[in-house]
């Protein structure tokens, strides 16, 4: 059997160009036509895409801040003011966790997503994994991101 040879680019979404600390599903992503992506779950310890807190959830780092500006729940100035680290070509996961988390919480507080029928339907359809995941991540946040074996009783 003769196989056709081909070539491509392996590009982590996080490596796409972005002024907001990490590549995401914004216009820059659409500029790449044929590409394979690494796992896109929320990264765990060591920020590896292969060590995720969920097999089903998406990584919130990949939410396009430009789309949130277009929706009116963030401003371009808020995004520009955020400190994602000093080097534009290096992902600073510590700053990313702080700044993108802050911006995403701010966007959520300004949104009416709770009244969005598509969002409500998504939550209902996926509650078999989403409820436990949301609870786990909320408790993890309460314990400052520590591993669950270090949580207080």
Predicted segments — roles?
Residues 2-153:
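Acidic/aromatic-lined carbohydrate-recognition and catalytic surfaces
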């Amino acid at each position: 059997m003769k196989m056709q040879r081909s070539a491509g680019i392996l590009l982590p979404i996080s490596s796409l160009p972005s002024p907001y600390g990490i590549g995401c599903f914004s216009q820059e992503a659409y500029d790449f036509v044929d590409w394979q992506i690494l796992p896109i779950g929320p990264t765990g310890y060591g920020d590896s895409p292969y060590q995720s807190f969920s097999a089903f959830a998406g990584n919130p780092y990949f939410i396009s801040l430009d789309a949130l500006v277009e929706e009116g729940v963030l401003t371009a100035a808020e995004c520009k003011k955020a400190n994602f680290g000093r080097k534009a070509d290096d992902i600073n996961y510590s700053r990313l966790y702080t700044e993108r988390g802050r911006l995403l919480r701010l966007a959520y507080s300004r949104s009416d997503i709770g009244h969005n029928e598509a969002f409500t339907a998504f939550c209902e359809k996926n509650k078999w994994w989403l409820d436990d995941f949301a609870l786990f991540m909320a408790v993890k946040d309460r314990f400052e991101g520590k591993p669950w074996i270090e949580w207080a009783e």
